[in-house]
Curated annotation (Swiss-Prot):
This is Enolase. The active site is at 204 (proton donor), 349 (proton acceptor). Keywords: Cytoplasm, Glycolysis, Lyase, Magnesium, Metal-binding, Secreted. It is an enzyme of class 4 (lyase). The lineage of its organism: Bacteria, Pseudomonadati, Chlorobiota, Chlorobiia, Chlorobiales. One of its GO terms (biological process) is glycolytic process. It catalyses: (2R)-2-phosphoglycerate = phosphoenolpyruvate + H2O.
């Protein structure tokens, strides 16, 4: 029987050189390892990432307390349990912590254990993780959101919006879609060089040039698609996706430039323009009429429910509106959004909620209410590829895991290539069917 014999955690470094938690789970016949990601722009409603705060060690970002919690409290509680009983393990972790936001043990400690247990269970079962979680129906590869140009909190430039992404929707296989993304990435690099712009990359591997405006940023991405030999899609103003091969997705991370005192969106990095919620919603409406935008994540601030409702009423029938800081992978926040009729999609970040079971519950709630799910990385990543497995396990249809550079991002794409190869003729690439708008 796959009984947990030992759970051991260590402190490792993420892609930004900050400490994070890695967990090993040992049973009498299997092994699982998971590393925990970390975000730069984090929602106030996220589960608590436990850090030590001692400025003499990693500038206060050390996670040795979370590591200690795994090696003592959690190890003592879970040793002897069946590693294949995922929901029981996760429930035990929640009860052991006992707080609504996992602040006692730390979401980083809890998540590392939850995911490592799932991997040990898969190892015991002789199955890849996506089959172990999703069963025989786990056959759908995700359409990637590829972050090719960075701004906001992810880059030291004068662009307000955090991510400008491409989505290859006009292809039959994941491997062809990935090739498109890589070729557009290199075309964008050449384009930036030709204009004398910086080709250094941000946290997620996208370029971070100092361009004149937010408009110039999206126009550079659109131009690069054409230079790579691909057809850019049309504006969704009249509904439908047309016959374009590539569409644009945005993550403005609007909470980052929302002034809670003024109750206005302030473009601090560029023009200094200040917009009310009504004006911000109208701004995005105008952009979707002008540009081939299929998805906007966090187009409004995390607690601007009225603004989210305005935006959803304006463009929610033709543009995917993804809640990240709004929903924080939390079923209670998502249920509130569903009731209020805001957004139509949820970003799924495993470390926002803290256990695999809760993550799967959020995806299920979204699906039952007609919301799409986008499985996502964080800006601080590791070589861990669990999110690629979860994307296929849940048939989510979309994944957001960075640009076509930096090994911490490429690791997820390479894992999806391997899964596509394993699935062979069963593999499905949803293309335009990944969207419900």
């Amino acid at each position: 029987m796959p009984i947990i014999q030992r759970i051991f955690a260590r402190q490792i470094l993420d892609s930004r050189g900050n400490p994070t938690v890695e967990v090993d789970v040992f049973t009498d016949s299997s092994f699982g390892r998971a590393a925990v990601p970390s975000g730069a722009s984090t929602g106030v409603h996220e589960a608590v990432e436990l850090r030590d705060g001692d400025k003499e060690f990693y500038l206060g970002k050390s996670v040795m307390k979370a590591v200690e919690n795994v090696n003592t409290i959690i190890n003592d509680e879970l040793s002897g349990m069946l590693v294949t009983e995922q929901s029981e393990i996760d429930n035990a972790l929640l009860q052991l912590d006992g707080t609504p936001n996992k602040s006692k043990l730390g979401a980083n400690a809890i998540l590392g254990v939850s995911l490592a247990c799932a991997k040990a269970g898969a190892d015991y079962s002789g199955l890849p993780l996506y089959r172990y979680i999703g069963g025989t129906l786990a056959t759908q590869l995700p359409v990637p959101m590829m972050n090719v140009l960075n701004g906001g909190a992810h880059a030291d430039n004068n662009v307000d919006f955090q991510e400008f992404m491409i989505m290859p929707i006009g292809f039959d296989t994941f491997s062809d879609a990935l090739r498109c993304g890589a070729e557009v990435f290199h075309a964008l690099k050449s384009l930036l060089k030709s204009k004398g712009l910086n080709t250094a990359v941000g946290d997620e591997g996208g370029f971070a040039p100092n361009v004149k405006s937010n408009e110039e940023a999206i126009e550079l991405v659109i131009e690069a698609v054409g230079k790579a030999g691909y057809k850019i899609g049309n504006s969704t103003a009249n509904g439908g996706l047309g016959d374009g091969q590539v569409m644009i997705a945005l993550d403005p991370a609007s909470s980052e430039f929302y002034d809670t005192e003024k109750k206005k969106y302030v473009f601090k990095k560029s023009s200094g323009q200040e917009l009310t919620s009504e004006e911000m919603a109208a701004y995005w409406e105008s952009w979707t009429e002008k540009y081939p935008i299929i998805s906007i994540e966090d187009g409004m601030a995390e607690d601007d429910w009225a603004g989210w409702k305005l935006l959803t009423d304006k463009i929610g029938k033709r543009v995917q509106l993804v809640g990240d800081d709004l929903f924080v992978t939390n079923t209670e926040r998502l249920a509130e959004g569903i009731e209020k009729g805001v957004g139509n999609s949820i970003l799924i970040k495993v470390n926002q909620i803290g256990t695999l079971t809760e993550t799967l519950q959020a995806i299920d709630l979204a699906r039952r209410n007609g919301y799409t799910s986008v499985i996502s990385h964080r800006s601080g990543e590791t070589e861990d590829t669990t999110i690629a497995q979860i994307a296929v396990a849940t048939n989510a249809g979309q994944i957001k895991t960075g640009s076509l550079s930096r090994t911490d991002r490429i690791a997820k794409y390479n894992e999806l290539l391997r899964i596509e190869e394993q699935l062979d003729t069963e593999a499905i690439y949803p293309a335009k069917k990944a969207f419900r708008v």
